Structure formats: structure tokens, C-alpha cells
Amino acid sequence: IFDQMFGGAQQTQQRGLDVRVEMHVSFTEGMNGLDKKFTINGHQINVNFKPGLKNGQKFRLAGKGQPHPYNSNLPHGDLVIHTHVEANVNFILQGDDIWIEHNLPWYDIIRGCKIEVWTPDGLLAIKVPAASYPGKTLRIKDKGYPVYGKNKRGALLCRINATYPELNEQSLEYIDKIKHNQENANG
């Protein structure tokens, strides 16, 4: 009775210990998914990871950890896999969206144009609409990072940055004419 009231009874371990593993993968492996082999207690475990692995994601494989140290009839612990997805210098991952930046001459931003940008899937043609502005973000649906375990992807977000070439006297005169025409049109 005393032990029951004050918790003096020791709890016994009901299963083996969990095994924790840190798994480092590249951005491309995380995006495309991969098969990975783990060796636990001399046994090889094959795990298939679907496309869309994220940094910090945890996976628990029940019964794939350590056996119970004293009783082989009790269940094994679990294998806990903690993922680390390396950053990519060309792409910024934000949720399931991938951000990229593209530099364009200011006149192409104003007039509009077609550009080709590098994505994790390769080159992609994008239309920059006329009357765009520096810092504008173009959103392309379903071209971002895969959503883990689903047949779905985030968006590709392309931020347009302006470049300003050195202008000669004639170019500056054209700009002055455009400015003058615009001021007259606005009254």
C-alpha cells in the first residue's frame, strides 16, 4: 500500500530503446525523394523517402530500434530518423514555395519580355508583363517544392531585379523626352 500511495514501485522497461539517426541529404535528394539504407544492430533497413523532404522532418519506424536488453519477447524500440536538407545557393525554400531572383535591364521590365530562368527542374520560360517594376514577384503555380506524400507542389516565385546600364548622352536625351511626354500627358 505504501508503494502504491507514494510511487515507490519501479517501472520496468517495456520495450527496447529507440535508435536516433541524423540523415543529411542534398536539396535535390530532398526534392526528388530517395531510397536510404540504415544498418541497425547488424540488420539493414531500407527506407523509401517520397519527394518533398524538409529540413527538421522526423520519421518514426516502429519496432526497428534496439531489442530489449533482457527479454527478447518484448518489442524492439523505434528507429527515429531526423532529416537535414542542405540549403541550395540558387533557390530559397519557404514552405513549399521556391524563391529565385532574376536580373533584367530596366527597359525590359518596363516593356515586358520573355525570360528563361533556372529552376530545380531545368530551364523554364516566363513572361514578364509590360509595366512591371523592379522587385515585382512573378508566381508560377505547381513549379515549386513537392508537398511530402502528396501529388502536389508549391509555387515558383521569381523576384525581378532591375539592372541599370551606363547610359550615353543620346540615351539620356531619349529618357528626357519620355519624361517630358509623360508629364505633358498627365497634365
Write out the residue ranges for each language-model feature:
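Intrinsically disordered, low-complexity linker/assembly segments
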Residues: 43-44, 48-187
